[in-house]
């Protein structure tokens, strides 16, 4: 089959199960499956719970779950996640890898030429590659410590299945941290005693009742609360609606501090305070200076609940470095006028103030600093532990702040080996290298094996990685600097991907295995990750398309090759696992929350636990810090950390500081050549790269078939660009095409391209094969083509995607066809 025939076979993807047959539905899906087409089935997703009805064995209708009063329109993209030309239909192997194995020409990796093979052959190739790497290099040669959002469901966690099965074969390099909150989750345990970013926050009803001022600092909950780690309830939108009314009535003052007008600011109609990108720490320091000089800070709270204020003050006042952090000092850097800074300092201590931090602010070079400094401001205000006061780092995520039940949640399929199990290759010799590396530094490790770096008080020695495995995971979305990734991938001997779609990660792999979607298998999930509102039956909507299999089935077959199938499955089938997880949860909730038998639960589709309980974060600590100390070394809030100071890092010292960036807009380093700051935040219409494959839904927001790039009117006018133009965005790291959206929500010097846009490189001749070239143009608009791949600091070594400058221009000539979504060039040999 040639590429033209392959694409022709997928051309009817726009048909979404409204009648007739489709080449996207294999015969077994159209046959009598025993699934009743007259009933609504329940399932869940990161976008919320919903119900579907089938026709001719395919999804025909989708509607919101009964309990979801604020469903996101993303459920309109669900059908396109199942029926689309990007689906991995069969096991496939990169052409040259099939011919030469670990001695293949790795410069061809990414040219998208693949050969269809059987499941048996693909799994044996997978095992053979693992055998070769473990024999020649040991566990340091294999990296399988992935990170990612996976699909919802407690049984079919792609990461758990892969790591359990591969772990039965041998040991491997793992990761620490994640891309979402890497800097925050590392610094905050030193300051507040826990990671905070994934902690439950003060209940929304208490905030609405007690807060006088809410500061949304680099935080856009109205956009980000559309999705959740488990099946999302969207209950937080009810509280945002109440907050909107209180803002309108003048009962609560909400201030959005952000480089752009967020969706939340527009929805609430609240105040907007623009701050130049990456300069928030200067604004915070100036507020602290004003609070100290005007004696606005709460000395009693500082003395009773914190440590290190006396070491911090000399830096703020300038006696330490000769630079007083006054509003006049901060204004030229952050772009906020001195009188506004002074007014803001007074506002923060007038009445009850709740600071709500977003996550994107810590995805920059020195991203630890704004989180630390925000905690210091909250300490100086003195309201930590009071209802409607203090600071939170997660009220934009998974309905944190919705009153939660105390019900036990269902367990999950195990990620690790069971007790007393040993892998076939049981070596733990990592040849002097570290067995765990910071999550965002794996490309560094491939390019510089043996290098020693600092990380969170330890020394990390990069292993010599030869093989990588990705399961339901798309690092060619969430990692930075695509061309640097290409250089690294050319050094690998083997890359294996298990996925639903032909993501860019699959494109740059050697062995690709087709997993079915969430909606083509059964599972069970928590309804509401933090609200813990109930349990959801995730009922199979349709049969798996083509030759795709569930994660459970894929790795059960793989384990069988190892002679460990029964060990892997614990001798239980998919439905037996689901029933076991449910019954264990039922037993744990006995006497507290009523749950029916499994058959009744599965038929009705869910169990609802009822309303949750009100709770205030850090209230116990405030009530008695000796009985309820924080998890810091002192048990107190650490404004100054002696432990961090002892590390001796120049880029993360003993207290929060302003540190210049490698590149920064609005007069900062590099802005003469590349004056625009690129904001690559979470998307409006996806979860990262999930749902970008949904063709009809994607077409509701793309511009000229490309990912939108949002541009200020002034910057657009200067470059002769209007709405709908195709724009080339570029810097020294790469180039991409995107569709222009001119909007006054964005100030001069700022452009936005949402992360999650699928990387679609094409050669200079516009060919798909040429996409393997370093420097290739991304035809669709992946912002990580341009971003900087450096660690935040020696402490967290997290990603710094928001430290990124670009330029843009109107694209001249005929734009190449988008290459992101059409699948591989299938070759017959």
Swiss-Prot record:
The keyword Lyase belongs to this UniProt entry's keyword annotation: no
Coiled coil location: none
Main location: periplasm
An example Gene Ontology biological process: anaerobic respiration
Record's catalysed reaction(s): trimethylamine + 2 Fe(III)-[cytochrome c] + H2O = trimethylamine N-oxide + 2 Fe(II)-[cytochrome c] + 3 H(+)
Source taxon at top rank: Bacteria
Cofactor(s) demanded: Mo-bis(molybdopterin guanine dinucleotide)
GO cellular component annotations of the record: outer membrane-bounded periplasmic space
Pfam families referenced in this protein's UniProt entry, alphabetically: Molybdopterin, Molybdopterin_N, Molydop_binding
Signal peptide span: 1-31
Transmembrane segments: none
Annotated Mo-bis(molybdopterin guanine dinucleotide) binding sites: 180
Keyword annotations of the record: Metal-binding, Molybdenum, Oxidoreductase, Periplasm, Signal
GO terms for MF: electron transfer activity; molybdenum ion binding; molybdopterin cofactor binding; trimethylamine-N-oxide reductase (cytochrome c) activity
Compartmental location: Periplasm
Post-translational modification: Predicted to be exported by the Tat system. The position of the signal peptide cleavage has not been experimentally proven.
Known EC number: 1.7.2.3
UniProt function note: Reduces trimethylamine-N-oxide (TMAO) into trimethylamine; an anaerobic reaction coupled to energy-yielding reactions.
PANTHER family: TRIMETHYLAMINE-N-OXIDE REDUCTASE, TRIMETHYLAMINE-N-OXIDE REDUCTASE 1
Protein name (Swiss-Prot/TrEMBL): Trimethylamine-N-oxide reductase
Naturally occurring in which organism (per UniProt): Shewanella oneidensis (strain ATCC 700550 / JCM 31522 / CIP 106686 / LMG 19005 / NCIMB 14063 / MR-1)
Gene that this polypeptide is encoded by: torA
